[in-house]
Regions:
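Glycine/charged-rich beta-loop-alpha catalytic/anionic-binding loops adjacent to active sites
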Residues: 34-39, 105-121, 144-150, 207-211, ...
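Short beta-strand segments
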Residues: 70-72, 111, 125, 150-151, ...
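Phosphate/diphosphate-binding glycine-rich loops and adjacent basic-rich segments that engage nucleotide
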Residues: 473-559
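Thiamine diphosphate
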Residues: 55, 115-310, 314, 379-459, ...
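Cofactor-binding active-site loop characterized by glycine-rich and histidine/acidic residues
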Residues: 26-173, 178, 189-207, 477-478
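Conserved acidic/glycine
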Residues: 1-53, 59-60, 244, 249-399, ...
Length: 678
């Protein structure tokens, strides 16, 4: 391994480093002025004191081979990796030509996705999971490269950082985790954050994990550490933690005031420890550069920054008319089954669970770049809790079908990451054994929904998230929950919930073939339900945003999905027998996008609407449907829009309690009858 030191490092390289460090520091010090002039950069986290390690990260990053996930303090990292001062300013003042997000993401979040300098979240540490996912793809496709992910030491207190390090060690992934340790998490000192003085030592027991400690204030020690880390990760296909000891010369950010929690002695110490001043003195002391040469470099950096500033200030602002661009990508459009229906009457009916299993296998054959993982999905004789993935690992191998740790963040986050490696990749994940246990991964769900919009259309995670959802199985509080009402509030995800086997197959096929992120809800009570079993054409497809009229009628429109579709069909039949009422039942199938056209045409015809779903009435998705009908179709209504759903309580385990809480046929019947008689 090449070793860097003050005596033997090439002079031209030293000049380059000093230029980058001087330019970076000048911009770091100038950034607050933009806010004072009302030009932007309302969030700025100064990096001064992290100079050595940030220079080294960028210098070691190899464009075309590596992926880099910098965090919000990584200004010099981005410069050192090849981004220009102008590009950094464009991000800082949120211009339309910001290469990372087009002015959509927060200032001080530097990115250039075309170089695989990734656009990351403000929730520091979440990107470690994405890094592990990219590294998994590198291993599978035998790609020569590493993934570098960077953040402060305090982020290691987050559970998802632990999950990323554990997973990368378990899978032997070439990830370099760089922890820039300045001793503080905003105002919280390290002693209140972690048990070990050196944070990386908390992870010293991990098999396959190498830990390198370095002085992040020193250019040469940092360069040697990062060079060693990259060479080790490449050669051994193992993860590395580079723990860099830094100082934070300024406040955490422009909204922080460090004099409220740091004394004068500490403030004097960190200023004296300034890495840029030390590097300058070292260059002079060892006579590698003269005072004149250093001043020439400083003058060039000053002029270059002024030019970059002038150019960036003339860049266009984002167009507010574009806010709806890149919320969701264009989906796969079925060609044969354009309306998502079929007329097959010959053949054997298939259970819901069989339809999902067979469709997964068919799509894995269709696209060899399709992968699936989750909890319990790949045991020899078992494919998940409900055997949905049974037989898949045997056919497609352990590299494409495998069980994940019981770590929901890791399951979702690595799916986001792996899909970054190549847009051809499609990832299907079982986000949790039951939807009830998915809540720890909501942060990663948010990341998946934001990516396309936040990156200004440069990246979208091609991920289908499967969740076994709902009740009616006597599961109690933690095997009966519905998540769609809460998750539907987050733009950037398609949400589908089939009620029958054929729709499960068709929607799953469309989800996997589409670009973008889809939440695929599987009502687990329907897996082996005779009522949900149907004939399923081998190539069946269902487009997003296309409802299905399950029963035609003229007196009342019932709008439903999932488990309650079957109750509603039974109720419609009962109402016809008992009162000669003609009830139309619409199975929306797709919540986002929602087929308002079909719903509206039905309500215009019947003039009465009842919305039924298993989720709670309060805060449930039906409220959005009801509001839309009330707003857009008020003049057509002969009665108030009504809703039926679960009570605003958890779901009880005793069957008596479950029946009282979840909507059933009798409750739906009474609501429908009351509405019909209105």
């Amino acid at each position: 391994m090449k070793k860097y030191n003050i005596k033997t490092t090439d002079v031209e390289l030293l000049k380059k480093w000093y230029y980058l460090m001087t330019l970076g520091r000048a911009l770091d010090e100038k950034a607050p002025a933009y806010l004072l002039q009302s030009l932007g950069w309302s969030f700025h986290a100064p990096y001064a004191g992290h100079d050595g390690i940030q220079l080294a990260i960028g210098q070691v990053f190899t464009k075309g081979e590596d992926f880099l996930f910098p965090y919000y303090r990584d200004m010099l990292t981005a410069l050192s990796a090849g981004m220009t001062a102008e590009e950094l300013i464009l991000n800082g003042i949120s211009k339309a030509t910001d290469p990372g997000s087009g002015g959509r993401h927060m200032s001080n979040h530097f990115a250039k996705p075309e170089w695989h300098i990734e656009n990351i979240s403000s929730a520091t540490g979440t990107h470690d999971l994405h890094a592990a996912g990219v590294a998994r793809a590198m291993v599978y496709y035998d790609h020569k490269g590493v993934v570098i992910t960077s953040h402060g030491e305090s982020a290691s207190s987050e559970g998802f950082v632990y999950e990323a390090v554990n997973g990368a060690s378990l899978e032997r992934l070439p990830v370099i985790f760089v922890w820039q340790d300045n001793g503080y998490g905003i105002s919280v000192p390290k002693k209140d954050q972690t048990a070990a003085r050196k944070v990386a030592d908390n992870f010293s027991g991990f098999k396959n994990l190498k830990i390198i400690h370095c002085n992040g204030k020193d250019v040469f020690d940092s360069m040697n550490a990062m060079t060693e880390a990259r060479e080790y990760a490449l050669l051994n296909r193992n993860p590395v933690i580079v723990h860099a000891n830094c100082v934070r010369i300024g406040s955490h950010s422009n909204s922080d005031k460090d004099t409220l929690y740091r004394d004068e002695n500490e403030l004097a110490y960190v200023k004296e420890a300034d890495p840029l001043l030390k590097f300058r003195r070292m260059l002079l002391r060892y006579k590698r550069l003269t005072e004149e040469e250093l001043k020439e470099i400083e003058e060039k950096a000053k002029k270059d920054l002024a030019a970059a500033n002038r150019k960036a200030l003339t860049a266009p602002d984002p167009d507010p008319k574009t806010i709806f661009n890149y919320v969701l990508p264009e989906p796969y459009e079925p060609e044969k089954y354009k309306d998502g229906t079929h007329r097959e009457t010959e053949g054997e009916k298939k259970f819901f669970v069989t339809a999902v299993n067979e469709t997964l296998k068919a799509e894995f054959r269709h696209n060899p770049n399709t992968f699936i993982w989750g909890q319990d999905v790949a045991n020899r004789d078992k494919g998940g809790v409900f055997n949905v993935t049974k037989g898949m690992q045997q056919e497609f191998g352990e590299a494409r079908v495998f069980s994940a740790p019981i770590a929901e963040d890791y399951i979702v986050g690595t799916a986001n990451g792996m899909s970054r490696f190549d847009p051809k990749i499609r990832v299907v994940i079982e986000g949790a054994e039951f939807a009830d246990y998915f809540w720890p991964a909501v942060e990663q769900y948010v990341e998946c929904t934001h990516e396309y919009w936040r990156s200004n259309g440069q990246f979208v995670p091609n991920v289908t998230l499967r969740l076994a959802s709902g009740g009616y199985i006597g599961g109690g509080l933690y095997h009966s929950q519905n998540l769609e009402g809460a998750l539907a509030t987050l733009p950037g995800a398609r949400i589908v919930c089939p009620s029958f086997a054929d729709d499960a197959a068709g929607l799953l096929r469309t989800s996997i073939r589409s670009r973008g992120f889809t939440l695929f809800i599987e009502p687990k009570a329907l897996y082996n339900s005779v009522e949900a079993a149907t004939i399923v054409p081998d190539d069946f497809e269902v487009p997003f945003g296309k409802a299905r009229i399950r029963r035609e009628g003229s007196d009342l429109s019932i709008i439903t999905y999932g488990n309650t579709t079957h109750f509603c069909l039974n109720v419609a039949e009962r109402l016809e027998k008992e009162g000669s009422w003609s009830v139309e039942v619409i199975d929306i199938r797709s919540l986002i996008p929602l087929d308002k056209e079909t719903i509206y045409e039905s309500v215009k015809k019947t003039s009465k609407a009842l919305i039924v779903h298993e989720d709670k009435v309060f805060g449930g998705f039906g409220g959005e449907i009801a509001a839309s009908i009330g707003t857009d179709l008020f003049r057509y209504l002969d009665a108030p829009v009504q809703r039926v759903g679960s009570t605003f309580t958890p779901v009880g385990f005793n069957p008596i309690l479950e029946r009282a809480i979840l909507p059933g046929a009798d409750r739906i019947f009474e609501a429908a009858k009351k509405l019909l008689e209105y």
